[in-house]
Regions:
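Pepsin/retropepsin-fold aspartyl endopeptidases
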Residues: 1-338
């Protein structure tokens, strides 16, 4: 979920539809040298790097210090594409209105795009009927998806109504290429050979020596990246979601933690056109595993749909302000106070 309409997080495609990965020779224009210790280590381990852009999707007039989405320049079926880097979405998504551009044929399904947010039929005028009418997702297979020098072939994707970008790069494909995402100095590092435990151990040692705190991630049953957290001592879990601008917690946790929540005019938009108004509150102690953030401004949302378990989200704003480095392949996140 995000504060702009976001693609579904609940697409489930068969794991048998595996992708093959190869390394292309030409150096793309967006592959840039990185002189940091992180870049040096990963280059020694055979990684490539693609810089990421930070963009205000749907709100070009937003203040400069507002959180921004991470965008990667990629190629879909040899056609240039802009994809949102979204660790909160397992399956890579392609926007339904870009199918002709990429020569992709959608296979319709009877599976609804679902969201824990309440129905947003009254928001139809705000975002446009065409977006909210698309409540079913389709599936397709890309011939190729290229990022930097890394080419993934035969890529299963979901098809959904996605505004502003050509699609969403999901965490499953990031895992396939052993991706390491630097949120504060936006870059995506990739290993065409895939994730390796020895590289993750070297990365852990280097980052901890530089003052980072390791936060173990767990892969949930629906392939989301989850970490332990607590709100003023109240334990919970949160999804690491670079596709969400805000860090959002279920309202009942805020009540239990004694948070004073203020109403806002901001609407959180979820998949399938669902929406909910958010409240904000100042949390004295927001702990992400062993990493503690003091006086954090958190958004609280009332998740009314009991068919889906509450999904608290650790959004890109909090990730950037705490210098997050996400080792998707190694299932670890590293945080350091900015």
């Amino acid at each position: 979920m995000a504060q702009v309409p976001a693609p579904t997080q609940t697409t489930n495609l068969s794991p048998a539809l595996a992708a093959t990965i190869s390394e292309a020779k030409p150096t793309p224009k967006d592959a840039v040298p990185n002189n940091s210790e992180l870049g040096s280590l990963l280059r020694q381990e055979g990684f490539g790097v693609v810089k990421l852009k930070q963009e205000n999707l749907g709100n070009r007039k937003a203040p400069k210090n507002n959180p921004k989405h991470l965008i990667i320049d990629a190629e879909v079926n040899r056609v240039s594409a802009s994809l949102m880097v979204d660790t909160g979405t397992p399956i890579t998504n392609i926007a339904r209105d870009r199918l002709e551009k990429f020569g992709v044929v959608e296979q319709k399904t009877s599976h609804r795009v679902t969201s824990p947010l309440e129905s947003a039929s009254n928001k139809r005028r705000r975002w446009g009927a065409s977006f909210l009418a698309a409540t079913f997702y389709g599936i397709a297979k890309l011939n190729m998806l290229a990022m930097g020098n890394c080419v993934i072939q035969d890529v299963p994707v979901a098809i959904d109504a996605i505004p502003y970008v050509d699609g969403v790069l999901g965490s499953d494909d990031m895992h396939r290429i052993g991706a390491v995402v630097d949120c504060a100095k936006p870059a995506l590092y990739y290993a065409p050979r895939g994730p390796r435990s020895d590289t993750s151990r070297k990365l852990e040692t280097m980052l901890q020596n530089n003052g980072f705190t390791q936060v173990p991630m767990r892969l949930t049953s629906n392939h989301c990246l989850e970490v332990a957290c607590s709100i003023n001592g109240v334990p919970s879990t949160v999804i690491v979601d670079t596709g969400s601008l805000a860090t959002c917690v279920e309202k009942s946790i805020g009540i239990k933690a004694g948070i004073i929540m203020k109403h806002t005019r901001t609407v959180l938009m979820g998949s399938g056109g669902a929406s909910a108004r958010i409240r904000t509150g100042r949390v004295k102690q927001f702990a992400i595993s062993d990493f503690e953030i003091r006086d954090a401004n958190i958004s609280f949302v009332d998740l009314k749909n009991v068919d889906h378990p509450p999904a608290n989200l650790l959004g890109i704003g909090e990730l950037v302000s705490n210098s997050a480095i996400i080792d998707v392949g190694g299932l670890s996140m590293y945080l350091r106070h900015y």
